[in-house]
């Protein structure tokens, strides 16, 4: 847990430097262990969040502050998400299990006004209360931030399935 969590800040610093140097797209994958089932292979919630939650918060906050200070807030789009959420209730081992009903998503920059909460869950966090955002909406958001979708439709040589999928994906509605 600890060694994996210590690398994110360095990776985000490298990503910012690559963007400043003109790189148009940087992908970071972490080896963070968000599985906090509280079983023989995984930490429980309290230990797990101490091991990865705090370092994640620190690294991402420092990255955002660094980008803002350098005037890169509109030029860099940070997206942080996982493939699933966690159960609304803590299990008998003090952990949480996989949950497909809701997934956290953090978006920063790219001209999107910060401080927004988009969507709402039920009080117990088990399912969406408002219209859910899905992977297609996320892809639509990324493509709308990166490309002029109208121009993309008329480009020669692009796979028609990709263009059709991207142009039909509704971006997440931010204020």
Language model segments and positions:
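Ligand-binding pockets and gating/stacking loops
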Residues: 1-175
């Amino acid at each position: 847990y600890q060694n994996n969590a210590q690398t994110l800040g360095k990776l985000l610093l490298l990503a910012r430097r690559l963007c400043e140097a003109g790189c148009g797209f940087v992908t970071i994958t972490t080896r963070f262990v968000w599985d906090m089932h509280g079983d023989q292979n995984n930490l429980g919630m309290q230990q797990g969040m101490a091991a990865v939650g705090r370092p994640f918060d620190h690294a991402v906050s420092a990255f955002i502050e660094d980008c803002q200070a350098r005037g890169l807030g509109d030029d860099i789009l940070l997206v942080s998400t996982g493939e699933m959420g966690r159960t609304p209730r803590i299990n008998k081992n003090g952990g949480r299990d996989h949950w497909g009903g809701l997934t956290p998503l953090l978006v920063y920059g790219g001209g999107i006004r910060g401080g927004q909460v988009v969507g709402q869950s039920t009080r117990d966090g088990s399912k969406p209360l408002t219209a859910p955002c899905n992977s297609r909406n996320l892809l639509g958001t990324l493509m709308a931030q990166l490309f002029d979708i109208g121009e993309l439709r008329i480009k020669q040589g692009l796979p028609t399935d990709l263009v059709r999928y991207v142009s039909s994906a509704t971006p997440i509605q931010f204020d």
